[in-house]
């Protein structure tokens, strides 16, 4: 999906060398025309390796989006981890969500999703994320397994006052 609302379009060709979603929060998600889009109101990180960043520092963009080209939304695996205590022992349960459920929860304002780390193989990207909500549990780790896809980053401006 081409987006003419943004000045810059960057493919994720360098696996985090130039652009990264680490610690970036999405408060809205959409899926249309086989594009899974995460809206990032506080932008994402641009490293000094990027041609547009002459600051020699890792800085944020302003509001931006990142798109993943996905053939079938049903192919995305969402694993949500919940920690709890039972009989004095700490346990972690794993719940499988479909992507539609995550989209609904984020878009309803019940939670946001924070990207923590990316792992990329020849057949998928796995994102380690955090689901943050205003009600208990306030924080749950999750994994997004997105099949063989590339990310495209859309943004307008660097915010040189927002350094890593």
What are these regions (language model features)?
Residues 1-164:
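Surface-exposed, interaction-prone regions used to assemble/regulate multi-protein complexes
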């Amino acid at each position: 999906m081409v987006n003419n609302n943004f000045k810059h379009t960057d493919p994720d060709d360098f696996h985090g060398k130039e652009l990264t979603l680490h610690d970036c929060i999405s408060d809205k998600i959409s899926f249309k025309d086989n594009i899974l889009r995460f809206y990032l109101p506080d932008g994402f990180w641009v490293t000094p390796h990027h041609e547009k960043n002459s600051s020699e520092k890792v800085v944020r963009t302003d509001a931006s989006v990142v798109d993943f080209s996905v053939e079938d939304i049903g192919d995305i695996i969402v694993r949500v981890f919940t920690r709890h205590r039972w009989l004095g022992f700490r346990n972690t349960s794993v719940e499988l969500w479909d992507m539609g459920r995550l989209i609904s929860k984020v878009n309803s304002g019940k939670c946001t999703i924070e990207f923590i780390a990316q792992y990329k193989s020849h057949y998928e990207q796995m994102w380690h994320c955090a689901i943050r909500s205003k009600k208990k549990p306030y924080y749950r780790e999750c994994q997004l397994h997105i099949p063989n896809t590339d990310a495209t980053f859309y943004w307008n401006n660097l915010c040189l006052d927002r350094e890593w």
